[in-house]
Each structure stands twice: as C-alpha cells, then as structure tokens.
Design a protein with these regions (language model features):
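Aromatic-rich carbohydrate-recognition surfaces in CAZymes
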Residues: 1-75, 98-106
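Glycine- and aromatic-rich loop/turn segments at beta-sheet edges
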Residues: 2-16, 63-90, 141-158
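Catalytic cores of carbohydrate-active enzymes
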Residues: 65-74, 95-97, 104-181
C-alpha cells in the first residue's frame, strides 16, 4: 500500500523484477473495458469477480495520484505519447496533467460510479460521481480557453495552459463527451 505503484496496472510485465509502470491510463482503460464487456455480454459474475480490482485501481489513483483539483497526475511521458529521445527526454513532454488522461479519468470515475451502483455500493457510487463532477468542473475551468476557443493539451506548472496541437484533443469530444459545447 505504500508503494507509488500500488494499485496500478503495469504497462509491461516480464517478471516480478521487470515491471514497467510508465502508463497513466492502464487503470483507466481497464475499468472502461470491464464496463464495455458487461454492456456487451451481461456477465455479472465477471463484473463481481473484477469489483475488488476496479475498486483498488480507482481508490489508489484517488489516494496516490490526484491533485487538489481532482486531476489525475502522471509522468511527463506516461501518456500513449511516451516516446523518448535516446530513452531519456520525452519527445512530446506533456507535464503531469494531459487532457486525454483527465477525460479518461472522468470517464473512469463515472463508470466506476455506475458499476458501484449496479453492485449496490451506493456510498462508493456517490463518492466517485462527486469526484467525477469535480474533475469536469475543473477541466472546464483550467483546460478550456474561451477567448482562444481552444482546449489546452495539458497544464504545465502553475496551471499554465499548453496549446500544442496534438491528436489527444479528440478524446475530449468522444470518451465521453465532457464538454457541453
């Protein structure tokens, strides 16, 4: 429980001595895909068998990897844009709060809330839904720049908006729709 990687799904696992966690979205895609599987199959037994893993993934992210705005924090190259120059410096440094990760985080919290409700875990459902709403409100406040009519790719130090044009922007329109306009 004290490890910084506690509750994270690794990016790569070779053996217990060779585990790489350079992914911010492993937990997020896992929860989303369990939900998709349930929607497709109706396999409630599978959902029940995954509940403890889902709960651990979300709770460890809440406890260990969120900031005061509810944003999920990550390494500079821990998104799917994880290429590095000679294995060192990120090719596309995106700070610790990239837009696609925040949208997936919002989605994960909403799906987690739905799963918890489905499994009669009302208190957890309400808590995760409230956290999702916090992420949504803060995403709109910090990532959306109405003057430029743009969404920031990521937030840098002191919440400075980075308007680099990257394909990750499309996540904000589709996974799920986070913005009303």
């Amino acid at each position: 429980p004290e490890s910084e990687t506690y509750g994270r799904i690794p990016n790569r696992y070779v053996n217990k001595d060779d585990v790489i966690y350079n992914t911010a979205d492993g937990n997020l895609w896992f929860v989303r895909e369990v939900w998709e599987y349930l929607q497709y199959t109706g396999d409630v037994d599978f959902l029940n068998s995954m509940w403890d893993v889902i709960k651990l993934a979300i709770e460890s992210d809440i406890k260990n990897r969120t900031d005061e705005f509810g944003f999920l924090l990550h390494g500079d190259a821990d998104t799917w844009m994880d290429a590095r120059i000679k294995g060192q410096q990120p090719l596309s440094p995106r700070g610790s709060r990239a837009n696609d990760i925040q949208v997936l985080w919002y989605t994960t919290l909403m799906i987690g809330s739905n799963i918890a409700k489905y499994l009669n875990q009302e208190e957890i459902s309400n808590e995760w839904k409230e956290k999702a709403n916090t992420v949504k409100v803060n995403f709109i406040s910090y990532f959306l720049n109405e003057e430029k009519n743009m969404i920031a790719d990521c937030l840098k130090e002191k919440n400075t908006q980075d308007f680099a044009i990257r394909p990750n922007l499309f996540f904000t329109f589709s996974v799920p729709k986070l913005l009303d306009k």
